[in-house]
């Protein structure tokens, strides 16, 4: 299902993960949490993003590999164009404040962060 909006493309895939996959991924996320970060050079206000992140794609997990393959297949996307799969954990009161994911062209980070494509999924 695609939500119609002139501002963003959001897709919903009902039952994309089964209950067992959800349980396994949730458990994996809790094993390697680190403070979530933002793309920024130097010091920044850490209250912008207060969640924790797990880089699931760095874990050697069959369930994560299967889900990654399913995502790439559904989008007809070669795996080399996808980002490392991540999972986020938010405790009560934690947040990722309103922001824009873009580089304006003058940003020194553009070279580093636009060499590889990326897709975000929120489960």
Give a label for each model feature.
Residues 1-123:
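Fe(II)/2-oxoglutarate oxygenase catalytic core
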């Amino acid at each position: 299902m695609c939500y119609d909006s002139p501002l963003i493309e959001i897709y919903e895939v009902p039952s994309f993960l089964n209950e067992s996959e959800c349980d396994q991924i949730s458990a994996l996320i809790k094993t390697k949490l680190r403070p979530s970060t933002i793309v920024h050079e130097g010091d920044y206000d850490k209250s912008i993003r207060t969640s924790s992140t797990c880089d699931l794609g760095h874990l050697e997990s069959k369930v994560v590999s299967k889900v990654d393959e399913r995502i790439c297949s559904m989008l007809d996307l070669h795996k080399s164009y996808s980002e490392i799969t991540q999972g986020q954990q938010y405790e009560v009161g934690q947040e990722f404040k309103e922001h824009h994911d873009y580089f304006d062209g003058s940003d020194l980070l553009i070279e580093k962060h636009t060499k590889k494509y990326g897709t975000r999924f929120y489960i």
